Design a protein with these regions (language model features):
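Catalytic centers of nucleases
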Residues: 1-49
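Acidic metal-coordinating catalytic centers involved in nucleic-acid phosphodiester chemistry
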Residues: 28-175
Length: 175
């Protein structure tokens, strides 16, 4: 169920983890007839404005966009933003190939932030570091893989255990 009000705009659900982090989840199973997400598709769905708004609304806010479709280099850019020591190091060492540079420039445009302004650059990196563009495969192979992992932890019929775990997660909101 999508949360009501301003906080629920552009998200399927919100969770708070044990560390007090508030996680906003947007899930999209498809992108019309496209087999991946282009930056323009995400812009069309207002993902950049919504993620920025949620992340900037307070400390410990994270935005997750989850889909079985690929994102190009966007998820890699966000991972790199989480592993830098300074804004200048990020530009020098993490934005180091043409594809990543192009995606970074698109993010700069879509988030309406300017890398030449040191405070806006820090804000852009902060937003990217708090965004997760997760690729989640669906299908029979993934189900078998998940049940294989379950079999290494639990004893019993793995499909039954998977169903019980899914039911528990849905009933308690523990994701």
């Amino acid at each position: 169920v999508e949360p009501l009000g301003i906080e629920g705009e552009g998200v399927e659900f919100i969770s708070t983890d044990a560390h007090g982090n508030q996680n906003y989840y947007q899930c999209k199973a498809s992108n019309t007839t496209h087999s991946s997400w282009a930056m323009s598709d995400l812009q069309h769905h207002d993902v950049f404005n919504r993620s920025k708004k949620h992340i900037e609304s307070g400390d410990q806010k994270y935005y997750y966009f989850i889909s079985p479709l690929q994102y190009g280099e966007l998820d890699e850019l966000c991972k790199r933003a989480r592993t830098n020591s300074s804004a200048q190091d990020f530009l020098t060492y993490q934005i180091n190939n043409p594809k990543i540079k192009a995606v970074f420039s698109e993010c700069e445009k879509h988030y309406s932030l300017d890398r030449n302004n040191s405070q806006e650059l820090k804000n852009l990196i902060y937003i990217l570091a708090h965004c997760y563009f997760e690729h989640y495969s669906i299908g029979e192979e993934e189900r078998r893989d998940l049940e294989g992992r379950i079999g290494t932890i639990f004893t019993g019929k793995t499909s039954t255990i998977r169903n019980l775990l899914e039911q528990y997660a849905n009933d308690t909101g523990s994701f």
